[in-house]
């Protein structure tokens, strides 16, 4: 898609009245899609470009705001989707907007046969960066990630939401070259859920025999057991991801089974059978302390986020590290949807993760729906294990770094 040509009828009088930054932040779509020049538009401002990712939600496109000349991400979901979730995700983004580490949402509306959500364009995911760093992160990098993500998850929880989709593909750095290129962002709220009832203002009830929701590799033990998720489960899944980064892999990866149901069972059984001390062996005691704490939380209990953050900030300081955002990937070339760029080393130490307004140049990429090479259910293990629905994930480039993926069978995402 040639972005240098004008968008024809896309620049309407109504469009010119829209905010140049957001371009029409409305849940009611203005007449969109094709123009006389054959250019596909979302709303009056956003031109749709090349595909940069796909999944069971639909597909992700690179876009451009014709008024600001800035790139955006456009998430498309078929209007006739059997399990529509994009409008709910848009609502959750609106609830969470205006804080650091959450991409800004610009627009929601129809685009031909699709519903479209326009968001900021971000840089690579932590999974992409993990690959770039030979699949191991140093303690310093993991602690800088962990301190930020505890803060992100705390913020999500303060907005009455639980996330339920922890995996490295859903945490992205800012777009290289922007002010917040070193901040870790949380994306993809398609599986998020309100844990505080909006009418009664009470915590959702404890339930059992629930379908699996999330990614099997990282999900909590209680999720494997079919228990309703709450705040504790998001934090436990983060702990599993932190150990994945430190170890390079987890003991329950690569397990073989005849059916997906059996495989999920094996993963859950192995998690329960792996003592925390063994999982965290040869790593600082704080990693084990974190997991012991979150696994002991009650379903209704509010986690002590300050305690968990302090565990890691104290370890960080004792180790003599400086919170300078000099991650393991600093200085390496980072492929992005708009070309390869080199990350700059931070010019000076910055303050630890503080809530600030977004830089309007930041961005969103979602690898939701992509498959990890050794985990054919990654990103899809939310489907009821008793009724798997197979879909074909087409050969597609990975959203952030354009790594080729082969065709694989995956589970249909369900609400």
UniProtKB/Swiss-Prot annotation:
Record region (Phospho-regulated basic and hydrophobic (PRBH) motif): 369-415
Residues that bind ATP: 52-60, 75
Modified how: Autophosphorylated. Phosphorylated by aPKC which promotes dissociation from the cell cortex.
Catalytic activity: L-seryl-[protein] + ATP = O-phospho-L-seryl-[protein] + ADP + H(+); L-threonyl-[protein] + ATP = O-phospho-L-threonyl-[protein] + ADP + H(+)
Keyword Chloroplast appears in the UniProt entry: no
A molecular-function term among this protein's GO annotations: protein serine/threonine kinase activity
Listed transmembrane segments: none
Stretches the record annotates as Disordered: 1-36, 340-383
Annotated InterPro entries: Casein_kinase-1_gamma_C (IPR022247), CK1_Ser-Thr_kinase (IPR050235), Kinase-like_dom_sf (IPR011009), Prot_kinase_dom (IPR000719), Protein_kinase_ATP_BS (IPR017441), Ser/Thr_kinase_AS (IPR008271)
Stretches with biased composition (Low complexity): 27-36
Domain (Protein kinase): residue spans on this chain: 46-316
Biased composition (Polar residues): 358-370
Tissue-level expression: Testis.
Regulation: Stimulated by estrogen. Repressed by 5-iodotubercidin (DB04604).
Assembly and oligomerization: Monomer. Interacts with MTA1 (short isoform) in the cytoplasm. Interacts with SMAD3. Interacts with DUOXA2.
Family named by the database record: Belongs to the protein kinase superfamily. CK1 Ser/Thr protein kinase family. Casein kinase I subfamily.
Protein name: Casein kinase I isoform gamma-2
Gene field: CSNK1G2
